[in-house]
Design a protein with these regions (language model features):
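Terminal targeting signals and extreme-terminal segments of soluble enzymes
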Residues: 1-164
Length: 164
């Protein structure tokens, strides 16, 4: 057992997801680095995340022209993919128990048009954690203005790629 006078492992202490490292270009933020090329996650682009107090985390996306719809704003599918990923990264930063989860539901309200070129910040709140589920809610802001609100439920599963 570790001596209580030892400094805690920062990555465990702040609730940062496993495998995350401090982002050199954004002090105070963490990242998993680049997602595997050609993966669905890679289409979202670089994700940053950080704890934001007890039960809260923030996840950041950098939308580009690739995330736009034909009307010139961010495509709803790209926004919902980001929110889905933010529930995991932001939820872990908020103190969600470590484990493998799948999304059971995600409800998104589109409040304002998001635009490329300015970061999206998903402010994630862990509302409740049970043995098998995590209940989350949040607001995605761009330039400090709310663009999307969401609620979602994640189900903890026993092993990856196994039936729930």
């Amino acid at each position: 057992m570790a001596d209580s006078s030892e400094a805690p492992d920062l990555m465990e202490d702040v609730g940062v997801p496993t495998g995350a490292t401090p982002d050199a270009d954004n002090p105070g933020w963490y990242s998993w680095g680049d997602f595997p090329r050609g993966s669905f996650a890679a289409a979202t682009g670089r994700l940053l995340f950080k704890p934001d107090g007890p039960g809260k985390g923030i996840c950041r996306m950098f939308p580009t022209e690739l995330h736009m719809n034909m009307g010139g704003s961010l495509h709803g599918g790209s926004v919902m993919s980001f929110i889905d990923m933010a529930m995991f990264a932001g939820g872990l930063c908020a103190g969600m128990e470590r484990g493998h989860y799948v999304t059971l539901d995600l409800t998104t309200h589109f409040l304002a048009r998001g635009r490329p070129g300015s970061p999206l910040d998903a402010h994630v709140e862990l509302v409740k954690q049970t043995r098998g589920h995590a209940f989350l809610q949040g607001v995605v802001r761009q330039n400090d203005q709310p663009c999307y609100s969401f609620t979602g439920t994640l189900k903890r599963i026993r092993e990856r790629n196994a039936p729930a």
